[in-house]
């Protein structure tokens, strides 16, 4: 009975398999092989991606990193800081835990592991890597969409009301809540709570989606009521146009913020000032005089 239990424990996928002493002299180690659930099938070999020589890059003659293979929409091989480089993990051997030894040795580094793809949906999260390139693409697109709305809002409000975007909050606090000059029947505190609840609910629903493609492009009657993405070829063009406009909007709003900090004026006022004297009213003159 004892021999049968010992043999079963030695062959158990949970307990692990004892490594012969000849492999690691002077220490007793176990190689744990966990076998919960069904055994995963070997991944199918996919065709090797080929990168064409006429692929557009961010700079003529630039060398694209290996992890930017052109598969993402709007990928021009620009990653000077290597932020999208796949994470590399060290694999350690198990520490020696043999009570019969005078000294137990720590596990050594036995190799490295690199995730091939970071968009692996699980019941709890859509990505296997928090700082992976797929997660960065989602953040870039979401921030770009907010920047497009913010840029349009900053220009529209200043054009229609004359109030700059950086002073909009002060006007609301002094004169009360309003929209395009029309008073609203809500206080600032009520509007803040409405914004928190509405945006919080939307973000909660978006983060509940585990499909990385649907997280970026949900589509449907709410987000594509005109059916513009029905044609796959047209969809690719629209996605490329969106990411280009998103990047331009993020740079534009960064310029709005720098202008507001340097001059205290809005973007339209700064633009009119520059057009009145283009040779002497530039960003260089502004910073040199401040």
From Swiss-Prot:
It comes from Arabidopsis thaliana. It is found in: Plastid, Chloroplast thylakoid membrane. Chlorophyll a 1 binds at residues 78, 140, 247. Binds at least 14 chlorophylls (8 Chl-a and 6 Chl-b) and carotenoids such as lutein and neoxanthin. This is Chlorophyll a-b binding protein CP29.1, chloroplastic. Its main location: plastid. Chlorophyll b 3 binds at residue 203. Chlorophyll b 1 binds at residue 58. Residues 1-40 form a transit peptide.
């Amino acid at each position: 009975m004892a021999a049968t239990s010992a043999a079963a424990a030695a062959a158990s996928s949970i307990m692990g398999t004892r490594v012969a002493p000849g492999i690691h002299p002077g220490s007793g180690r176990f190689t744990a092989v966990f076998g919960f659930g069904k055994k995963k099938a070997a991944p199918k070999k996919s065709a090797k991606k080929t990168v064409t020589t006429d692929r557009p890059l961010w700079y003529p003659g630039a060398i694209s990193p290996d992890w930017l293979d052109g598969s993402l929409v709007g990928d021009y091989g620009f990653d000077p800081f290597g932020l999208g480089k796949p994470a590399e993990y060290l694999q350690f051997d198990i520490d020696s835990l043999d009570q019969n030894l005078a000294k137990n040795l720590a596990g050594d580094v036995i190799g490295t592991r690199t995730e091939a793809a970071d968009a692996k949906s699980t019941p709890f999260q859509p990505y296997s890597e928090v700082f992976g390139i797929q997660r960065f693409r989602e953040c870039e697109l979401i921030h770009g969409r907010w920047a497009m709305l913010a840029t349009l809002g900053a220009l529209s409000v200043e054009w229609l009301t004359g109030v700059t975007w950086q002073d909009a909050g002060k006007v609301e606090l002094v004169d009360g809540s309003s929209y395009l000059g029309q008073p609203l029947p809500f206080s600032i505190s009520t509007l803040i709570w409405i914004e928190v609840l509405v945006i919080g609910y939307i973000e909660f629903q978006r983060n509940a989606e585990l499909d990385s493609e649907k997280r970026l492009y949900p589509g449907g009657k709410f987000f594509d009521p005109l059916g513009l993405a029905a044609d796959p070829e047209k969809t690719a063009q629209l996605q490329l146009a969106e990411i280009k406009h998103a990047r331009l909007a993020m740079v534009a709003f960064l310029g709005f913020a720098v202008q507001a900090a340097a001059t205290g004026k809005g973007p339209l006022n700064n633009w009119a000032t520059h057009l009145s004297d283009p040779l002497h009213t530039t960003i260089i003159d502004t910073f040199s005089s401040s």
